[in-house]
């Protein structure tokens, strides 16, 4: 490997779909690699077979690609450091576990889960932090071997634990948080590096993989801080150099003020959910990049290449990042407004079809009608899924008039405007936005009613709303029959 060549990785477990927090981890590693002309590795940590879900790996990869995050090495892009799934690396871990056993840096432990639980309960009752207490304390090598043989004869399967040195400080200069240190006696005692089924634990496999894949920097979430001293124990046991670590701040839900938790249903947290609602990938990329990292200056809208160019890990924040759904909507709206018509058309039409508002295989007339409808709302949409609710009046029976709307129609001029409008549009030879606008102007000219008193009654009567997109095109899309029906209904309600 070239000297100082940066290699980073994103190493998800296929136990669920791509979470916002995990997407941020992937994104920051990607930006760090691209900014420094390094290598970005995708590695699947699938040793927790009980929690893996069928499409977990596919979901991770599909959604990373959707966000615009591409990797240089991974399960689908093999390199010289593979395999890139931990489940395919068992033959790599086994001899290394054995090496530690042979050097007496690790040992087999036969304590059952029940015994370990009882030990923890006793410690808790004494007000002590739970920790593993060495089960062979005071025993000779011969006595230990005898105890292990007897346990094996009973059919018990061992775990392998690594020896944690006593009263030793493990510290590192964290890229985000600065100096962090742990006393070895506070990390829970000798910890498991191989489970009873022969699979390595996370804190062992991750060290082996990072070392053999020559990972130089590990950027990950704040929840991994407590894992780092354990991993440093493993690095030390093998005499390997550890990479640089950086632990990114927590993400806080602005609605609750609490840490973003997968159990928190007050906010959508998975990339799939935002895709389904019609958020744009570039907008999500932009928003997520600002969760715990800030550019120089006041601007917040940047494209991917701009983020790559200016990304500096020193600007990763120590303070919690605020997940603000309103800000995400604002950012996405900026991207919707700037996007090409075809992109928004395709995404919005899918939303209308999914909601059953438009047939699954629309004909040319329906597509053209939908194109005009979507264009009408493009500037207002925070995400394309909003088209379904925003354009509800075009698909469903008109809603009951609000009290504010009724007040607007209380002026006697409203009835004059609506009767004139209904009479004139009924016989329009061409029912389109131009002719509708000309009709409104002619009413103004003939009645001398203008401004809000002219336009608001027509908007309320036809669209049943007080606010919305441009009026004449909206009425054109409603169609003559529906517009006249709404006008008649409104006039009846006014009487």
Curated annotation (Swiss-Prot):
GO MF term list: ATP binding; glutamate-tRNA ligase activity; tRNA binding; zinc ion binding
One record GO biological process: glutamyl-tRNA aminoacylation
Major location (coarse): cytoplasm
Function as written in the Swiss-Prot or TrEMBL entry: Catalyzes the attachment of glutamate to tRNA(Glu) in a two-step reaction: glutamate is first activated by ATP to form Glu-AMP and then transferred to the acceptor end of tRNA(Glu).
Keywords on record: Aminoacyl-tRNA synthetase, ATP-binding, Cytoplasm, Ligase, Nucleotide-binding, Protein biosynthesis
Enzyme class: ligase
Record's protein name: Glutamate--tRNA ligase
Reactions that this protein is recorded to catalyse: tRNA(Glu) + L-glutamate + ATP = L-glutamyl-tRNA(Glu) + AMP + diphosphate
Pfam assignment, any one: Anticodon_2
Domain of life, source organism: Bacteria
EC number: 6.1.1.17
InterPro entries per the UniProt record, alphabetical: aa-tRNA-synth_I_cd-bd, aa-tRNA-synth_I_codon-bd_sub2, aa-tRNA-synth_I_CS, aa_tRNA-synth_I_cd-bd_sf, Glu-tRNA-ligase_bac/mito, Glu/Gln-tRNA-synth, Glu/Gln-tRNA-synth_Ib_cat-dom, GluQ/Sye
Cellular-component GO terms for this entry: cytosol
UniProt-annotated location(s): Cytoplasm
Source species of the chain: Ligilactobacillus salivarius (strain UCC118)
Motif residue range(s): 'KMSKS' region: 259-263
CDD domains: GluRS_core
Subunit annotation: Monomer.
Sequence similarity: Belongs to the class-I aminoacyl-tRNA synthetase family. Glutamate--tRNA ligase type 1 subfamily.
Motif ('HIGH' region): 12-22
Positions that bind ATP: 262
């Amino acid at each position: 490997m070239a000297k100082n060549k940066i290699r980073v990785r994103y190493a998800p477990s296929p136990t669920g779909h791509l979470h916002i927090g995990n997407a941020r981890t992937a994104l920051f590693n990607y930006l760090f690699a691209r900014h420094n002309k390094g290598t970005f590795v995708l590695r699947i940590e699938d040793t927790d077979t009980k929690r893996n879900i069928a499409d977990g790996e596919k979901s991770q990869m599909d959604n990373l690609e959707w966000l615009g995050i591409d990797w240089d090495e991974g399960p689908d892009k093999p390199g010289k450091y593979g395999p890139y799934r931990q489940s395919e690396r068992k033959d790599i871990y086994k001899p290394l576990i054995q090496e530690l056993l042979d050097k007496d840096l690790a040992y087999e432990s036969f304590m059952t889960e029940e015994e370990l639980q009882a030990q923890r309960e006793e410690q808790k009752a004494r007000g002590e932090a739970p920790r593993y207490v060495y089960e062979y304390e005071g025993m000779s090598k011969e006595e230990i071997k005898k105890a292990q043989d007897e346990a094996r004869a009973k059919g018990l399967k061992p775990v392998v634990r690594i020896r944690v040195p006593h009263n030793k400080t493990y510290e590192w200069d964290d890229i985000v948080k600065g100096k962090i240190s742990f006393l070895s006696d506070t990390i829970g005692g000798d910890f498991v590096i191989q489970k009873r089924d022969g699979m390595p634990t996370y804190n062992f496999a991750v060290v082996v993989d990072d070392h053999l894949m020559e990972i130089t920097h590990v950027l990950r979430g704040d929840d991994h801080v407590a894992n780092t001293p354990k991993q440093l124990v493993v690095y030390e046991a093998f005499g390997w150099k550890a990479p640089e670590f950086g632990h990114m701040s927590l993400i806080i839900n602005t609605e609750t003020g609490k840490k973003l938790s997968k159990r928190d249903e007050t906010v959508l947290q998975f990339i799939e959910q935002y895709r389904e609602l019609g958020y744009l990938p570039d907008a999500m990329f932009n928003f997520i990049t600002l969760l715990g990292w800030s550019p120089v200056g006041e601007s917040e809208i940047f494209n991917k290449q701009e983020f790559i160019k200016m990304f500096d890990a020193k600007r990763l924040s120590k303070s919690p990042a605020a997940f603000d759904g309103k800000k995400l909507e604002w950012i996405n709206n900026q991207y919707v407004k700037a996007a090409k018509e075809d992109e928004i058309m395709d995404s919005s039409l899918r939303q209308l079809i999914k909601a059953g508002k438009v047939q699954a295989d629309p004909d040319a007339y329906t597509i053209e009608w939908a194109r005009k409808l979507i264009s009408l709302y493009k500037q207002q949409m925070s995400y394309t899924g909003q088209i379904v609710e925003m354009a509800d009046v075009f698909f469903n029976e008109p809603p009951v008039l609000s009290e504010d709307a009724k007040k607007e129609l209380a002026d006697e001029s409203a009835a004059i405007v609506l009767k004139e409008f209904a009479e004139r549009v009924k016989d329009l030879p061409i029912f389109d936005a131009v002719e509708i606008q000309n009709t409104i102007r002619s009413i103004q000219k003939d009645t001398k009613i203008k401004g809000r008193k002219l336009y608001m009654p027509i908007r309320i009567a036809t669209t049943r709303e007080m606010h919305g997109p441009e009026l004449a095109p909206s009425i054109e899309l409603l169609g003559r029959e529906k517009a006249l029906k709404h006008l008649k209904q409104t006039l009846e309600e006014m009487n």
